[in-house]
Amino acid sequence: MTKQEALKFDNDKLPYYTVLCTQFPLAVREVVGRSKQGHDKYEKEDDWENWFRLGEERGVESYQNALMRHFFKDGEDCELDHDIAVAWNALAILEFKLRKNLYDNR
């Protein structure tokens, strides 16, 4: 009996697990924790979309301002908390822009 190699055609697929859980597991965990803090603090609905309800124009500007405040370590957070907040705010800005692009290209 010969040993056969299994085929899996996934070379062109995005490696979500590898990137999120292998490359950046600690960073992802902290950003998820920061997201939960925000959800608990500003919860309006249980859908985790309260951050998005600001609307694109107000939301992007608000999160850009927050990102810069944390980038310059303005406030009482420790350095690592500021870095986590920078990452979260960058993701929020990117998500606004990607959603706009997705809907504009329909």
Residue ranges of each PLM-predicted region?
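Intrinsically disordered, low-complexity regulatory regions
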Residues: 1-106
